[in-house]
């Protein structure tokens, strides 16, 4: 079991969000402060925004990234999709955002601040092993995840069956199995 091999810390993304702190750059800065406290290389696993943060960290701190598990990642933000998404968000009730730890206004601010993110030219800085995953039904992120895998020098792509974007909710057993198999392959 991977949990027996590693000291695991599982921060909640909302821990990096403070009042008036809902831009990507501010959340990323808080995330870096958190990760840089650890003296050993960190093994990062992130879903969606968490995957973007983990990838960004491995680019900026390649010596500190031991491995990455990126679930439903984007490396070049789909600007048009984000704009459509933000229009839809404006019509959604505030209650829809509570489960993800954001208020509606802050979530819209965050997604707007991410529109210009593009790590394409910096992907060669990622030196650690990377497992890229996507749910088989995640039509929005699957192509980007497959493309990202091809652009990284030490990456493997896995599709998680019977799941959409929230792989951890849709097929937690499949997710754990894929991570543990990958951990064994790269000797984590």
Name each model-derived stretch.
Residues 9-43, 177:
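Active-site loop/oxyanion-hole signature of alpha/beta-hydrolase fold enzymes
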Residues 20, 163-172:
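Catalytic histidine-centered segment of alpha/beta-hydrolase-like enzymes
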Residues 24, 52-55, 59-60, 67-94, ...:
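Flexible "cap/lid" loop of the alpha/beta hydrolase fold
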Residues 46-51:
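Conserved alpha/beta-hydrolase "nucleophile elbow" surrounding the catalytic nucleophile
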Residues 95-121, 137:
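Hydrophobic, aromatic-rich cap/lid helix
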Residues 126, 132-134:
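Short beta-strand/loop motif that positions the catalytic acidic residue
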Residues 139-145:
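Conserved alpha/beta-hydrolase "acid-adjacent" motif
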Residues 169-183:
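Post-His helix in hydrolase/transferase enzymes
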């Amino acid at each position: 079991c991977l949990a027996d091999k590693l000291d695991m810390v599982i921060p909640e993304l909302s821990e990096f969000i403070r009042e008036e702190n809902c831009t990507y750059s501010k959340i990323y800065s808080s995330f870096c402060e958190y990760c840089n406290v650890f003296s050993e290389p960190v093994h990062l696993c992130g879903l969606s925004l968490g995957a973007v943060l983990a990838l960004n960290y491995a680019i900026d701190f390649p010596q500190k990234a031991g491995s990455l598990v990126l679930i439903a990642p984007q490396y070049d933000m789909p600007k048009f999709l984000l704009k459509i998404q933000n229009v839809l968000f404006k019509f959604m009730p505030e209650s829809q955002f509570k489960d993800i730890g954001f208020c509606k206004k802050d979530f819209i601010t965050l997604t707007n601040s991410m529109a210009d993110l593009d790590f394409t030219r910096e992907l060669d800085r990622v030196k650690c092993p990377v497992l890229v995953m996507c749910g088989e039904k995640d039509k929005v992120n699957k192509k980007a995840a497959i493309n990202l895998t091809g652009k990284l020098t030490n990456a493997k792509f896995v599709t998680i069956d019977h799941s959409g974007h929230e792989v951890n909710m849709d097929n937690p057993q499949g997710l754990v199995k894929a991570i543990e198999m990958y951990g064994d392959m790269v000797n984590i």
